[in-house]
Amino acid sequence: MGVDHSAGVDLEALACPAGARELGSQLMGLRPGTHEFGRDSGTLQVCTFREGLAQKIGHDLIIDVERWEAEVEVGHDGTPSAVRLEADARSLNVREGLHGGKPLSDKDRADISKTIDEKILGGQPIAFRSSALERHDGRLTVRGDLTIAGTTRPASFEMDLREDGGVSGTLPVTQSEWGIKPYRGFMGALKVRDTVEVVLDAALPSD
């Protein structure tokens, strides 16, 4: 997500560690019905990636979404038929700043979160609604509409339902397609990659 450098926020780069989420290869069946879950049973994070000649002086960030809820509707055959997710754009908090010349302070993290809220997302709701789910090669491709910062566009991601009852998926988001300008600093030598990842990892409620 882009940040206005004039705001005085030390947000040179955002990133998620490589391999932070490894999706399984087997798609399991689920109990028919509507499964609701949220922060109490999982995590929703935004992972961003730095680039540019000066990327070594920047930080990679992992941003937690603190308030969110999701639903998965499952048909009689045990296969999901719909996915919905809503998140509070004012609840994004920086969990960790990786790499960089010096660690992020608590103030740095708070300033970054404030800038994301006020200058980027504007407190507008974040929502995803599926329109089609396709099962193939032991995985589920979820297609639908994603709303960020007042703009709604098509989006898709791979979802994995694990044998332990967990659900995981990574949704790539190209910021500029939602009207968000990725951060650039040091005359363009340090940039936030346009495509970020929204990573879900949660446990579905048991019977």
Question: Where are the predicted features?
Answer:
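Hydrophobic alpha-helical signal/anchor motif
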Residues: 1-3, 7-9
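Low-complexity, acidic/polar, glycine-enriched regions of mature
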Residues: 14-207
